[in-house]
Curated annotation (Swiss-Prot):
Residues 1-15 have a biased composition (Basic and acidic residues). The keyword Metal-binding applies. Pathway: Protein modification; protein lipoylation via endogenous pathway; protein N(6)-(lipoyl)lysine from octanoyl-[acyl-carrier-protein]: step 2/2. It comes from the Bacteria. Residues 1-33 are annotated as: Disordered. It comes from Hydrogenovibrio crunogenus (strain DSM 25203 / XCL-2). This is Lipoyl synthase.
Amino acid sequence: MKARNESMSKGEYKTKSLKNRPDPTQPKLKKPSWIKAKLPSAKHIGRVKELKQVLREQGLNSVCEEASCPNLGECFGHGTATFMIMGHICTRKCPFCDVTHGRPNPLNQDEPRHLAKTIHAMNLNYVVITSVDRDDLRDGGATHFKNCTQAIRDKMPDIQIETLVPDFRGRLTVALDILAQQAPDVLNHNLETVPRLYEEARPGADYQASLDLLKRFKQMVPETKTKSGLMVGLGETFDEILQVMRDLRAHDVEMLTVGQYLQPSDFHLAVQRYWTPEEFKQLEQAGMEMGFTHVASGPMVRSSYHADLQAQGQFS
């Protein structure tokens, strides 16, 4: 793969070959007043720097930084983080996502040990482990997920672990069999958007395959909670989101997050609409009526934002 031209931004390089490439000259919608990320308080700034330093020393990546999450300051300030394993280079080029695309490096076989050591040093009670897509690996990275989960549990037997997994395209059966050998407390896989927008927003992904992943794992490991996440603002309708929620419940998904899509750069998909706090509240109420055990729905909600409280049904 050719190296990125230094004059080209990460977003421009990532989306330059897409069939439906976003138009960087498209006028941008003005952000409403309710789109505000919380900055870390003065007392938490030191903690944010400390956690970033720990990640660098252990050679680890946090999705909080790689995906430019708007809640980074708040979550790091409170001493929580979502760890991204298997490197920071993704084999997919979804035009809504700010993670780097390209040819990934070989797996770091010491990463599970380093990850467990770091989590132990941070004294976390709940941890979220996610990854880039690794279509270059025969099992999609499932064995590495399993090894990381095992290493963490060996170091901290009482910790709760949530894994936010990719779709394991073309190798789902093998991947699920491996993941079930060391099952997390919560298995999360994000549908991201409505099926009508998959070709544009999730090229290479399959809506039904993602639903099947969630249902099949729940059937294999009934005691593991299943979870998914959606973003809104790409042009979907309220009714389309409700239908996706119904599909999730029909596939035994118990927990849901819904948040506003925010454009990482001019070269990513543009925001078509900002949903109001009232609409997010309506989605939360509808989800609870459908039978979800918990729904976190709000403009700044992200898949792993306050994941520990979501798992305990304490965050709204």
